[in-house]
């Protein structure tokens, strides 16, 4: 994958840490979105402080991010993921990759039907009680 042409979208960007990691890995076009104004401001500050150029959007994924991305990152808990997974599918390129994390053991069985409905699991990693998935569209 040529990272120069990849758009990476971080959903629920928070502090923007995943954008900083993506930039460190060589991804040039970075977008973070968060519904919380404070989080969006912090992400912008952290990107600026680390000399990372990123578009930060305070808003709703469905209406405020108009493009698609080849890589989408979402470190979110189960409740927002259950709502957002169908929207994320519309924002991910057909051959793109979605990486979700923030899924704790206690809620694993609850999220799996949402994942299995529209997504193919490429890889699952477990660290203690936490699960991370790399997914692609079915």
Give short role names for the model-derived ranges:
Residues 85-97:
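A short glycine-rich, Lys/Arg-flanked "PGG" loop and its adjoining helix->strand segment in the class I
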Residues 1-61, 65:
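Conserved SAM/SAH cofactor-binding pocket of Class I
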Residues 66, 93, 116:
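Short conserved AdoMet
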Residues 38-42, 80, 107:
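Conserved short alpha-helix immediately C-terminal to the canonical SAM/SAH-binding motif I
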Residues 29, 98-99:
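A short hydrophobic/small-residue beta-strand
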Residues 104-138:
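Active-site capping/gating segments
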Residues 71-74:
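Hydrophobic beta-strand segment of the Class I
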């Amino acid at each position: 994958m040529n990272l120069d042409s990849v758009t990476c979208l971080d959903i629920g960007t928070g502090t923007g840490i995943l954008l900083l990691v993506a930039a460190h890995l060589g991804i040039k076009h970075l977008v973070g979105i968060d519904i919380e104004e404070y989080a969006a401001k912090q992400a912008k500050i952290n990107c600026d402080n680390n000399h990372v150029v990123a578009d930060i959007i305070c808003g709703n994924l469905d209406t405020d991010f108009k493009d698609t991305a080849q890589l989408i990152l979402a470190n979110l808990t189960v409740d927002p993921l259950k709502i957002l997974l169908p929207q994320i599918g519309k924002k991910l390129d057909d051959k793109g990759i979605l990486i979700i994390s923030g899924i704790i053991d206690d809620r694993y069985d609850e999220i799996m039907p949402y994942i299995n409905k529209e997504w193919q699991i490429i890889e699952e990693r477990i660290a203690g009680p936490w699960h991370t998935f790399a997914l692609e569209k079915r």
